[in-house]
């Protein structure tokens, strides 16, 4: 009897609801970050979030008797990823402090498009097809609408948006590198060691560049930090990877378009951020691009087949 391929499984209704729930959790993370910024410094927020997440993942690994120690030759790989991870998060948090949550959510969800482009050159078998190329065009058309938004120009958001774009590009590089090495060890080890590596650097950044580490500690700030640390960075990681192992990437990635919708909607509802016509158009184009990229017809030809030896 042939072995069942999880990537080919259809999700039952309960799994569909659970996946949608996870996508909403991830999509609303930028809102939680912005709320935390109202009481904590930029790098202080990152340091607290990932130190808490590292502790939670470490305890989860111990309770579930996962192997924490790295094998020979893995340390260098994890350190390379950890450096990219730290740069990525530093840029993202800095950029988000100069923009708003809904714009950050939209820009963060350009990640699949950057990954597709890099994977075309560096991951054997991952080629940009005509369909994917069209999806990329849709996604970046959405970015054009974002930068044409008059209210964003008046508010001075473009600097933050550009920093977030740089963060997403570094994030894509880290993801493509991770795809090349991930088969050699459990995913949780990468997350655990990268967060442990980044925390001292985030605290150093907080001491050097945050005007104040803590300037207002109230219930919304505490809840926002717990949400980032325990819900998205800890529970979200375990839950998503559990679903990924059970049902496969194809099934789960069909729902990622929900993330930017959640980010924009909650940014407007909870933070009172303006949802302008151009933001709505940007959302439509980016969500459409994600949907096109993750739609899987049976056969498709590569748009620009090239040699990709490294």
Name every feature range the model reports, one short phrase each.
Residues 46-48, 104-110, 177-200, 229-269:
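Helix-helix packing/entry segments at the starts of transmembrane helices
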Residues 57, 115-117, 121-122, 153-210, ...:
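Transmembrane alpha-helical segments that form core, pore/gating elements
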Residues 25, 29-30, 58-108, 145, ...:
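Specific transmembrane alpha-helical segments of multi-pass solute transporters/efflux pumps
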Residues 57, 79, 117-118, 131-149, ...:
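Hydrophobic transmembrane alpha-helices of multi-pass small-molecule transport proteins
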Residues 59-65, 111-134, 261-280:
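C-terminal transmembrane-helix exit sites in multi-pass transporters
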Residues 28, 35, 39, 53-71, ...:
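Membrane-interface helix-cap regions at the ends of transmembrane helices
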Residues 11-15, 39-43, 47, 70-75, ...:
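Juxtamembrane helix-entry segments on the extracytoplasmic side of multipass membrane proteins
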Residues 2-44, 83, 87, 91, ...:
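Glycine-/small-residue-enriched transmembrane alpha-helix faces in small-molecule transporters
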């Amino acid at each position: 009897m042939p072995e069942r391929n999880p990537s080919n499984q259809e999700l039952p209704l309960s799994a569909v609801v659970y996946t949608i729930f996870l996508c909403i959790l991830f999509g609303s993370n930028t809102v939680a970050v912005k709320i935390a910024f109202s009481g904590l410094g930029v790098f202080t927020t990152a340091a607290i979030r990932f130190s808490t997440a590292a502790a939670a993942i470490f305890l989860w690994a111990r309770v579930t008797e996962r192997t924490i120690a790295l094998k020979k030759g893995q340390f260098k790989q994890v350190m390379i990823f950890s450096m990219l991870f730290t740069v990525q998060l530093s840029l993202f948090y800095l950029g988000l402090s100069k923009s708003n949550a809904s714009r950050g959510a939209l820009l963060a969800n350009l990640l699949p498009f950057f990954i597709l482009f890099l994977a075309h050159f560096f991951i054997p078998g991952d080629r940009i097809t005509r369909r994917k190329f069209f999806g990329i065009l849709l996604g970046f058309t959405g970015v054009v609408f974002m930068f044409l938004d008059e209210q964003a120009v008046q508010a001075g958001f473009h600097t933050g948006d550009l920093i977030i774009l740089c963060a997403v590009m570094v994030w894509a590089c880290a993801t493509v590198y991770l795809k090349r090495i991930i088969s050699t060890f459990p995913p949780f080890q990468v997350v655990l060691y990268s967060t442990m590596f980044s925390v001292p650097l985030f605290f150093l950044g907080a001491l050097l560049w945050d005007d104040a580490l803590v300037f207002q500690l109230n219930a919304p700030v505490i809840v926002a930090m717990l949400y980032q640390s325990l819900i998205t960075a800890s529970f979200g990681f375990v839950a998503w990877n559990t679903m990924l192992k059970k049902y496969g990437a194809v099934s789960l990635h069909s729902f990622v378009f929900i993330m930017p919708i959640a980010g924009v909607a909650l940014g407007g509802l909870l933070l009172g951020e303006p949802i302008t016509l151009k933001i709505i158009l940007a959302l439509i184009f980016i969500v459409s691009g994600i949907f096109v990229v993750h739609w899987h017809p049976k056969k498709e030809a590569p748009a620009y087949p090239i040699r990709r030896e490294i």
